[in-house]
């Protein structure tokens, strides 16, 4: 298209030139006409060459610039000839030059358009090639999709055939099932008749045996209920006694604190008096030294001066002795203060250890309560007994909470008192006891300024005693629960070991038929085992109450709050505060409880022997693994 437009423009330009020369031809001389003819022939050849064969047009794309330059040269030659023409033709010459310039510009525009068209053609060719490549890819994908579709159709046909085969087989199996059900119904009808005949003869004896077994279990449960009620009453009595004992101990300690505060006030007054007296003596001593340093007057009589000197020397020696004694006493008090500080640190460490042990003991109690909850779910027939056990536990938890609240309150008071102990003169709380223990002719020495340290010490001792009582109770409860679960676990271990024909009296304390035969009485054996477990729990509660009675009010031991008289005397002699050895008082009680538990509970004796033979059983507070392995057996 671009070549055609270019050729049409060239043809139009040539026509315009012809018309122009034809117009201006009559006034031109013969030489000019000749030139015009020659130019016309050249133009005709150029036009004929421009409109010639397609081969000439193909060459004209690249060869049009030389033809146009030739035409321009032809046009310039007549212009040079026209320069000779008069001035009337100069205007025409200028017009011709303008037309030449316009033709040159048109030529440049045409060349520029040709280049742009070439670029567009190249881009179109590239786009066509890319489209061809994409078409090829699409054709390849189409072929793959066709193959996939063919394979899927083939697999669908295969699955349809298989489904038809399966439907046919299912119909055959349903028919076979119906035939088998008919045959089985006929067989079961005959077997039911035979079984009913056999069962009618055996059911009477089994029902009688079940009735006897249920009566025995009911009697055992009633006995267990009575034992648990008695143990609950004993626990309540022990709680009341312990509360009264705590009230008495608190009153006694309050009275003791009042006495100590009165003593502290009196010691304050004595300290002030002693300070005043020491200052007075120091003044008199300084005066005496000053008098001795001054020269004696020459005229005084000899006898009174010697008497005065002796008197002054004696008084000086006495004052020096008092000062020396005061210094020694202060040194002793500093040593006692250091010892008291060390004891306070030790007691604080013990208190921290007990506080760290409390969460561990709570975790142990929770671990012991978890298997108890599982036994509740398993033993549905002992719900009433387990409810009573839960009530006892709740009472114990309430007691523990009350004691913990009291301990926390006392701890807050102790922290307040210990913050007061941070004042200067800390730890000098044992001087008055030393002054009371020693009957010396010299005056009462000075007292430390921290007078609240004695009150803090007594409150601290009271708090430690209550902590010791709480730890005793927690350890006793752990012992009771531990022995109870250990007995149950040993009973459950001994249950499958015993022979089918024998009784289970060695394994369970209830005396009932704890185990059943291999083919009869499985549920009855489970109920009897649960009843035996309940009796063991009652026995453990009795033993636990005895442990509490012997631990709280032993006949040969003083109360845990009050120190022994021998210890008080020793404390007065050494000039130290009254300290009660809490750890020593806790350990023998635990030993007595551990020694008395097998004798109180008859079922614990074989268990203790077995535990001594096998120390691995029951060494931890949690339930052993073989008990959990026995539980699915019992569910069956």
Swiss-Prot record:
InterPro entries for the chain: GM130_C, GOLGA_cons_dom, Golgin_A
Coiled coil: 93-148, 211-263, 306-412
Disordered: region residues: 1-72, 107-127, 344-364, 422-449, 496-537, 588-612
Alphabetic keyword roster: Coiled coil
Compositional bias annotation for Gly residues: 509-522
Superkingdom per UniProt: Eukaryota
GO CC, any one term: cis-Golgi network
UniProt feature, compositional bias: Polar residues: 38-50
Bias (Basic and acidic residues) ranges: 109-127, 429-441
Similarity comment: family membership: Belongs to the GOLGA8 family.
Protein name: Golgin subfamily A member 8F
Organism this protein belongs to: Homo sapiens (Human)
